[in-house]
Amino acid sequence: MSKKNILFISSWFPNKIEPTNGNFVQRHAEAVSFKNEVEILHCIGDSSQKNTYIFDDKIINGIRTLVVYYQNTKNPLLNFSRRMTGYKKGFAKMKTPDLVHANVMQKSMLFAVYLKMKYKIPFVITEHWSGFLNINWSKLSKVQLFISKIIAKNASYILPVSQYLLSDLKNLGCKTKMKVVENVVDTHLFKIKSETPEIFTFLHISNLIPLKNPEKILKTAFKLREKYSNFRLHIGGDGDVENLNKIIRNNKAESFIKTFPMLTLKEVSDKMRNSDCFILFSDYENFPCVLLESLSTGTPAIATKVGGIPEIINKKNGILISNSEAELYDAMELVLQKKVNFDNPKILHDFVENHFSMEKIAEKFTNIYKEILR
């Protein structure tokens, strides 16, 4: 099959208002571009702008990326109308795609249904949203379920990023063909560490929202420090770092806990390569890129046994725990005392390379496109 024109659209995508939102979608698009011609179209509201529409058309990492900003209002129906119009205006500027690759079954992706109805362009949808996990079903509104059913019914394939999410979508009544295609890692950027840090270093990177439990990680580190002085914790990311700094100051822990702001991917890789153990202590997750990235640098992880995490972490590359602070303490102590034997960094990296590299994920998506377009 010759290279096909694939248009990525998404409910979430990095933009000037939310620079890291949906960055995993951008990485999927970059992977797909290894074997196809890819363009990206996104539309989002900006309440600060004067113009009804602004078109931000750029080449990002070799891919034409058009973000359409519409003037956001307090009227949700007007906002939705402007968003759909923004998508139509943006679509008119793009190459006609052979297939649309939509992301996240929220109302914006009704645009994929519109393109199918009007132009007979088939679409697949990658699903990342933890809202469809069983633990969150009670929060799903009837409107959200109705919209997602319309999108699912019209999709050629739904591609959840974890087996766990696929099972929960089936249990929600989803009848569309499904296949897991996981998140992707740039294994050339997230390369194996060359040496280990002098001081044992734990690392946590996230958006620091409550479900990631950054304060509980701090609390556990304070307790561990009462017994051990031979470690440090680096914690930060795209979130409220100042609140963490306040807690650290109040506990006089500045000497061994350091925070950092939002990082570039290169900086994330550098942090991981200069750490001994990554910590992800979330209440729920889907298939977190950050764990794959950590393993790709040869850094094992302590992570909660939720969502798709057990599909990534096992006793050879980390420790699975419940979201109990006592279990987090015990796991950190075991790792610090070197009482666990993980695979060597090359084996950890090769696991990611062989399953989640740009090339592997590009191949999985392209095989699905071929099946639909043959």
Regions found by a protein language model. Name each.
Residues 1-53:
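N-terminal subdomain of nucleotide-sugar transferases
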Residues 315, 319-326, 334-339:
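Conserved acidic donor-binding segment of nucleotide-sugar-dependent glycosyltransferases
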Residues 122-124, 131-151, 187:
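Nucleotide-sugar donor phosphate/pyrophosphate-binding loop at the beta->alpha transition
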